[in-house]
Amino acid sequence: MKIIFPILSNPVFRRTVKLLLCLLWIGYSQGTTHVLRFGGIFEYVESGPMGAEELAFRFAVNTINRNRTLLPNTTLTYDTQKINLYDSFEASKKACDQLSLGVAAIFGPSHSSSANAVQSICNALGVPHIQTRWKHQVSDNKDSFYVSLYPDFSSLSRAILDLVQFFKWKTVTVVYDDSTGLIRLQELIKAPSRYNLRLKIRQLPADTKDAKPLLKEMKRGKEFHVIFDCSHEMAAGILKQALAMGMMTEYYHYIFTTLDLFALDVEPYRYSGVNMTGFRILNTENTQVSSIIEKWSMERLQAPPKPDSGLLDGFMTTDAALMYDAVHVVSVAVQQFPQMTVSSLQCNRHKPWRFGTRFMSLIKEAHWEGLTGRITFNKTNGLRTDFDLDVISLKEEGLEKIGTWDPASGLNMTESQKGKPANITDSLSNRSLIVTTILEEPYVLFKKSDKPLYGNDRFEGYCIDLLRELSTILGFTYEIRLVEDGKYGAQDDANGQWNGMVRELIDHKADLAVAPLAITYVREKVIDFSKPFMTLGISILYRKPNGTNPGVFSFLNPLSPDIWMYVLLACLGVSCVLFVIARFSPYEWYNPHPCNPDSDVVENNFTLLNSFWFGVGALMRQGSELMPKALSTRIVGGIWWFFTLIIISSYTANLAAFLTVERMESPIDSADDLAKQTKIEYGAVEDGATMTFFKKSKISTYDKMWAFMSSRRQSVLVKSNEEGIQRVLTSDYAFLMESTTIEFVTQRNCNLTQIGGLIDSKGYGVGTPMGSPYRDKITIAILQLQEEGKLHMMKEKWWRGNGCPEEESKEASALGVQNIGGIFIVLAAGLVLSVFVAVGEFLYKSKKNAQLEKRSFCSAMVEELRMSLKCQRRLKHKPQAPVIVKTEEVINMHTFNDRRLPGKETMA
């Protein structure tokens, strides 16, 4: 008998039952906690504590389970396995064991050999493999089930290269731990072909932690810029050994590629002055990150690091932070794939996990802001190529952030001092520096004292005062040492070695060189200089020439011989022009008998001799009885008077100086004069900046001078300025030296003088070893002294001296025979000439009288002589037969003295 319940066949009832069953299942599902297992494989050392990565793995799982924010309905469990270092077989076995239990992902191991073994198994079975350390990826990488949270080293290598370029390093030493270091730093190793960079590569010893032999070799090779690619344990050991080797000074700059530099104990090196730079990926400035790290520290203290690890207690290492972030990134993918279930997998069956591909894709697409910043992956190779790095540097306060780097923007240096104002004494305060110098008056000299002096008190001078001012501003103490070989510093052409103060700076035997050390191109290549504290140039020191008297004919000196000749020619030319114009101008003829207005005879005073006499009279400022009447002749006379006014005024103005000033005639006036002769020897300080200037100069004159000096090297090059000055005083020798020293010497020795101007222009600067952090501080202090006027005051103090005695001033210099004796000679010559002319005139007149009176020449001459000696009135000699000239003939006459007026028939 079949019993039928009509209600069961009701469609409405059936839909209601299905809905209730669905709701019950959903409620059951939401109330049920899903359990998911992660696997972790970690290396360990026998009898060692739990590793930081394993501890971080457990810490991350426990944190997620406690918070229930990321996975509210999933409980994470873990299975951790420990293996020996580099044991790939054991790593494979442990991985298979975990896969048989059923794990959603395997974390670790760290070292490449073990990681590769686990990776191959994960690829075969489709289980994600999560790495937190760098692993070399080949170009045809087929590890599709692999992601790494460690920053991609091709990007990290670019960050290191950017840092090298920022510091403007020209030489770099790369020290790596194992062969993979060369792969990690491939961008840097390629740099020399693209940048002006010299690269030296060294490897740390593989079988021992003793790096002292390598460090000793680097110290001997003066390798100050070093990049260490090694673990933080090795980095801690290297720092300790470098400190013992004296390589933790301000001249060394180390860059560490390890991201755990911030966790090292750097307390012993804070005040050493060493430059230490590195990167940090842990975002410690984030408050949430700091809170997590603080919780981590409490658990870490339960399993402190090994004593020889070099890490500070409680610090979270980068590996631990990456492991913490790795667990959270995988958990994000779990959150997005709630229907995922884990099944047991067997390594020998090669049956992949059915959810593996989808789950791996979700992991690569995951985004997470973790302890190490933003986390994203390259979907192709699973590498972390987008990340942010903090650039950290060692300061006296500890390791501080000085910049950031990211693949997109590159390096951004901020030098943040946490709001502290910049202080130029930061790197020099309370430091004790070795200062090398050289004895050179007035820069550095021994202090004169009745009591014995010791240490820095033995010295005084301009450079000592400068050093004292720098010490006051920058707050350092110093010890002054004289350079051992007594040289400034020059390079030997044979072996390229330097000497003097430059060598001591190169060898780091001194921290500063405060001396008259010139800034030159060749020196700047091996040491650093501050801005110049004194500007100068090369000049010539020579004896003052002996004074020469003006000479008896010195009255001719105001005008050059050419001008005297031109004046004479001008006088002759003007006389001739005046004569011609006076003859042709009708207004220059006049009636010699004004009482007889009807006279037809006219005369012209400007004969050739009278014209010349007019010009000479005007030139001598005496005038004459001749005066031009016509406008044309007056124009000639006026222009000539103006000309003579200027000439005589100029002559008079210069005459006093030429008669009273004692002339100094030097055989040389410039470097060209020195180069053109060989009689006067010349030289400079051996191995000094002046010698180097002539040695390197390409200018023909200076090259010729260097050829002369090098050919007589033993005789013309001196050891010091004092020796050169003494040679100038005692022999025919010109000394090439700095103009400031010449200024000092000439103010104290009146027998010496500077010849010519400056041959070049340069400056004195404070020398420091190459790359010294003190240079910029000293430059700022020097500029401060310059603005305050203290540099000028110090120069006045040491250069002023007593000076040469000034000559007594005279209102009017007494002129002696040696000054104006020539005037008397000219006077005597004029008198003698006038006597001879008078005799000639006497003879000429006697001959004329004899012809007129038709008598002998001797009788006429005797009569003229008798009448001249008696000083009686002379009678005019009359001719015997007067000559009558007709009017027509007179009119046509062109004589030089008179002419007839036109229209007259007879002459009275």
Curated annotation (Swiss-Prot):
Extracellular topological segments: 32-561, 660-819
Location of Phosphoserine modifications: 846, 868
Span of the signal peptide: 1-31
SUPFAM superfamilies membership: Periplasmic binding protein-like I, Periplasmic binding protein-like II
Gene Ontology terms: cellular component: axon; dendritic spine; plasma membrane; postsynaptic membrane
Glycosylated residues (UniProt): 67, 73, 275, 378, 412, 423, 430, 546, 751
A Pfam match: Lig_chan
TM helices/strands, residue ranges: 562-582, 639-659, 820-840
Top-level taxon of origin: Eukaryota
MF (Gene Ontology): extracellularly glutamate-gated ion channel activity; glutamate-gated calcium ion channel activity; glutamate-gated receptor activity; kainate selective glutamate receptor activity
Residues at which L-glutamate binds: 516, 518, 523, 689-690, 738
SS bond partners: 96-347, 750-804
Presence of keyword Disulfide bond: yes
Reactions catalysed according to its record: Ca(2+)(in) = Ca(2+)(out); Na(+)(in) = Na(+)(out)
First-listed, main subcellular location of the protein, grouped into a coarse class: membrane
PTM statement from Swiss-Prot or TrEMBL: Sumoylation mediates kainate receptor-mediated endocytosis and regulates synaptic transmission. Sumoylation is enhanced by PIAS3 and desumoylated by SENP1.
Gene Ontology terms: biological process: detection of cold stimulus involved in thermoception
Annotated keywords: Cell membrane, Disulfide bond, Glycoprotein, Ion channel, Ion transport, Isopeptide bond, Ligand-gated ion channel, Membrane, Phosphoprotein, Postsynaptic cell membrane, Receptor, Signal, Synapse, Transmembrane, Transmembrane helix, Transport, Ubl conjugation
Cellular compartment(s): Cell membrane; Postsynaptic cell membrane
Residue ranges that the UniProt entry lists as topological domain Cytoplasmic: 583-638, 841-908
Sequence position, cross-link Glycyl lysine isopeptide (Lys-Gly) (interchain with G-Cter in SUMO1): 886
Additional observations: The postsynaptic actions of Glu are mediated by a variety of receptors that are named according to their selective agonists. This receptor binds domoate > kainate > quisqualate > 6-cyano-7-nitroquinoxaline-2,3-dione > L-glutamate = 6,7-dinitroquinoxaline-2,3-dione > dihydrokainate.
PANTHER family: IONOTROPIC GLUTAMATE RECEPTOR
Role description: Ionotropic glutamate receptor that functions as a cation-permeable ligand-gated ion channel, gated by L-glutamate and the glutamatergic agonist kainic acid. L-glutamate acts as an excitatory neurotransmitter at many synapses in the central nervous system. Binding of the excitatory neurotransmitter L-glutamate induces a conformation change, leading to the opening of the cation channel, and thereby converts the chemical signal to an electrical impulse. The receptor then desensitizes rapidly and enters a transient inactive state, characterized by the presence of bound agonist. Independent of its ionotropic glutamate receptor activity, acts as a thermoreceptor conferring sensitivity to cold temperatures. Functions in dorsal root ganglion neurons.
Quaternary structure (record): Homotetramer and heterotetramer with GRIK5. Tetramers may be formed by the dimerization of dimers. Assembles into a kainate-gated homomeric channel that does not bind AMPA. Can form functional heteromeric receptors with GRIK3, GRIK4 and GRIK5. Interacts with NETO2. Interacts with DLG4. Interacts with NETO2. Interacts (via C-terminus) with KLHL17 (via kelch repeats); the interaction targets GRIK2 for degradation via ubiquitin-proteasome pathway.
Protein name: Glutamate receptor ionotropic, kainate 2
Source organism of the structure: Macaca fascicularis
